[in-house]
Amino acid sequence: MKMKKIAAAMALSCLILSATAFAEEAQDRTVQQCFQKDELIVLDKQDVAGGKGTLHGLFSFTRDMAKPEQAIKEIGWMRLEKGSSIGLHKHGVNEDAYIIISGEGIFTDGDGNDTVVHAGDITIARAGQSHALRNEKDEPLIFLDVIAQNDGLQK
């Protein structure tokens, strides 16, 4: 019986230590300067902001990992397949830039104006502005998404 208690205590200690190591790794991720493709966090989201389909994402880090003093809260490679979209949504205190890498999309600004976007185009929604993006073409729409926030605006 004593051996079982010792083994259980050792297992619990290992579990606590490994959880602490993973927590530290997640916290340190936002100060990391280079992210290899195989290190990226896979995060797919459904029907984003009232849009349709799946938004496929590969992130260096996500906004829940960022510290208040870090302006860039999230960076990710994003992919929308044909028929998929990010619905029209308003940004409160953060800003969201899309850098189009490949494919063709339709960007909708806060006034409801549609603009066709291609590789090399950049869109941005500042705090207080709205935007949306959709893919109506057969080729996937690939873009880099950068979300930044000035936490001083919240005070």
Identify the role of each PLM range.
Residues 1-9:
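Bacterial N-terminal signal peptides that target proteins for export
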Residues 9-18:
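Bacterial N-terminal signal peptides
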Residues 22-72, 87, 154-155:
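A short, N-terminal "cap"/entry segment at the start of jelly-roll beta-barrel domains
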Residues 61-64, 76-91, 127:
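Conserved short histidine dyad/triad with adjacent acidic residue
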Residues 68-70, 86-91, 109, 134-135:
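Short histidine-centered beta-strand/loop micro-motifs
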Residues 70, 127-153:
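Ligand-binding loop in jelly-roll beta-barrel domains
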Residues 77-81, 92-107:
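Short, conserved beta-strand element in jelly-roll/cupin
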Residues 112-127:
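Short acidic-glycine-tyrosine-enriched beta hairpin
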